[in-house]
Amino acid sequence: MKEYILILSVLLFSACPAHAAEEKWLTTGSRHFLIYYRQAPEGLLERVSRQSEEYYTRITEALGFTRYNFWLGDNRARIYIYDSAEEYRKYSGQPVWSYGCVFIPDKKICSFSQGWDAFSSVLAHEIGHIIFHECLGMEKGSLPLWLDEGAACYAENPARCRETPVFLKASHRKGGLFTFDQLAAFIPAAAGEESIRLFYAESSSIVGYLFEEFGRDSFADFCEEFKRGRDLDKALRSAYGLAGRADLEKSWRRYLGIL
């Protein structure tokens, strides 16, 4: 499950901290994104610009949403590329396991220059977070973290969500999975790397299950229930006909073959 370490990120709703030496950032951009950098290779900048635009369209479609708010002009999302992991963590204040972070209200993504596969995963994951919250209405109450991260993981790479059963079955044999109550109470900042990895894997698997078993339109309906202020149990009942979170946990475990 090495790939899950690569996408570990921090989801934030507070204002983005001041970036060090703001005047020293260079900028480039595309239709929907502004990219801030210092010494990032030109090839990386070109790929970030091109790939972020592809994610902007693909992720919206993957989640089954219809866009009404477009990131144009001054409303473009901003991507900050630090020169190293040390610089990124120093000025963003993120933990050592973080490869990227996103500040939802400001549509700001922070990461650092690294191998393309890792950076691409971070980019897709964080764009997924912004789109997910934007389509739900960022002024609404907070979502369950497992749903937030699971949706971002699915938007990032649906195929990888389908690969999690092998890892989850092995984890189940070695000591068990998180219950839904444990997922709901999970705090990444207070957890170890193995627990964080398991949390991401379970979260992405649950959301992947909802897509695979019920389809994209039902997930959009599920999210619409949250937008209307419904709680998790009522949203599950309305969109999927499930009795609530306990019913979802039972059906998901049956889907994995570990009930």
Question: Over which residues does each language-model region extend?
Answer:
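Acidic/His/Gly-enriched intrinsically disordered linker/tail segments
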Residues: 94-97, 102-106, 118, 138-259
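A broad, structure-centric signal for solvent-exposed, well-ordered loop/edge residues
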Residues: 8, 42, 88-89, 130, ...
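Sec-dependent N-terminal signal peptides
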Residues: 4-13
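Sec/Tat signal peptide C-region and signal peptidase I cleavage site
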Residues: 16-20
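Selective for proline/serine-rich intrinsically disordered segments
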Residues: 13-15, 103
